[in-house]
């Protein structure tokens, strides 16, 4: 029997890598997109003849019920969200509606249509925010420091609530920062790699950033989607931290990125206070011990490999290599 999977947020970074993985595993893949959305399909352009894209909206439960009834997926991966932390401060209500309540609408649609569907919720390290312990575990208390983090906490707890209340196979992956050449330009890692390529090619002469001392646990998105899939292949539903267990600063990212093209980052990077967050999170670093123990998962891509991959891809992009996103 061919398994069918529904991915919300399929046009995003994680959705595109997850779609590739599921296709390789022999799945039929259905991607949900919003009819009103202005999102680009470039991340899945190389897959579009192998997947079905259908209309649905996390703000509209009737559309979710109809979608589940029509396509009868065995697994649902909820990756759709208003996912940019900075935007969540200017659009807190929309962030709550999509990133928080949208999870409830999807879970309730599953409960009504087919409670045997296995559900994955994309939780986030931003839920920890003002951290209570280092490294962060599945049991670490949440103290979110942005409307995005607050909405993700709601989505996380409602997933657990539906698991316990209705016996749904519902899992949350608490993913720490994960990057790739497909990362949006609004995220600091891609902002850096893209600027490095532009500076190297003579198309820019400086890069303005916020807090260079901000530290994150950065991994490769292509590695992390494997953990999502593995969660739904287990005998019992559970929640897992997905991380590298290492922390690096924005400054380190700059050093490696500029170093890749033989430039001194300090000559080009300018600190601009407008890029500082209203409330900065503390030291986010996750322990992937449980995922390693129970899922037999661990990251394959090192931090320097990730940075170099992103710089190389942006150089290729700016030099007209349109196949860079399929990598």
Predicted regions and their residues:
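N-terminal Rossmann-like NAD(P)+-binding domain of SDR-like oxidoreductases, especially those catalyzing
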Residues: 1-178, 222, 232, 301, ...
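Structural signal for conserved beta-strand scaffold positions within catalytic alpha/beta enzyme cores
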Residues: 46, 55, 172, 211, ...
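Residue-level signal for the nucleotide or nucleotide-sugar donor/cofactor binding architecture
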Residues: 59, 90, 98-101, 146, ...
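Alpha-helical residues within the helix-turn-helix
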Residues: 293
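C-terminal "lid/loop" region of Rossmann-like NAD(P)-dependent oxidoreductases
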Residues: 207, 211, 238-240, 248-255, ...
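Short, solvent-exposed beta-strand edge segments and adjacent coil->beta transition regions
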Residues: 139, 204, 237-239
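NAD(P)-dependent short-chain dehydrogenase/reductase
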Residues: 131-135, 145-147, 153, 157-233, ...
């Amino acid at each position: 029997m061919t398994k069918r999977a529904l991915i919300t947020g399929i046009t995003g970074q994680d959705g595109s890598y997850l779609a590739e993985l599921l296709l390789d595993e022999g799945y039929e893949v259905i991607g949900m997109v919003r009819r009103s959305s202005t999102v680009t399909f470039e991340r899945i352009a190389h897959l579009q003849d192998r997947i079905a894209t259908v209309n649905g909206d996390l703000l509209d439960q009737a559309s979710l019920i109809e979608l589940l009834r029509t396509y009868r997926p065995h697994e649902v991966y909820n990756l759709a969200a208003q996912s940019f932390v900075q935007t969540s401060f200017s659009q807190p209500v929309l962030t709550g509606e999509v990133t928080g309540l949208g999870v409830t609408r999807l879970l309730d649609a599953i409960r009504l249509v087919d409670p045997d569907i296995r559900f994955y919720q994309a939780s986030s390290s931003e839920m920890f925010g003002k951290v209570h312990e280092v490294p962060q575990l599945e049991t670490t208390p949440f103290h979110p420091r942005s409307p995005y983090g607050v909405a993700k906490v709601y989505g996380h707890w409602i997933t657990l609530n539906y698991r316990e209340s209705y016996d749904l196979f519902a899992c949350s992956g608490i993913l720490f920062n994960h990057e790739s050449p497909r990362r949006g330009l609004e995220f600091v890692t891609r902002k850096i790699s893209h600027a490095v390529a532009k500076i190297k090619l003579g198309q820019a002469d400086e890069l303005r950033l916020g807090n260079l001392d901000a530290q994150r646990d950065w991994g490769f998105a292509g590695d992390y989607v494997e953990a999502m899939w593995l969660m739904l292949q287990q005998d019992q539903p559970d929640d897992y931290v997905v991380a590298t267990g290492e922390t690096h600063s924005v400054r380190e990212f700059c050093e490696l990125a500029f170093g890749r093209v033989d430039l001194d980052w300090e000559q080009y990077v300018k600190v601009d206070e407008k890029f500082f967050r209203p409330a900065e999170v503390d030291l986010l670093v996750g322990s992937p011990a449980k995922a390693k123990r129970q899922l037999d998962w661990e990251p394959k891509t090192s931090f320097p490999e990730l940075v170099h991959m992103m710089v190389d891809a942006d150089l290729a992009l700016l030099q007209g290599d349109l196949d860079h996103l399929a990598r």
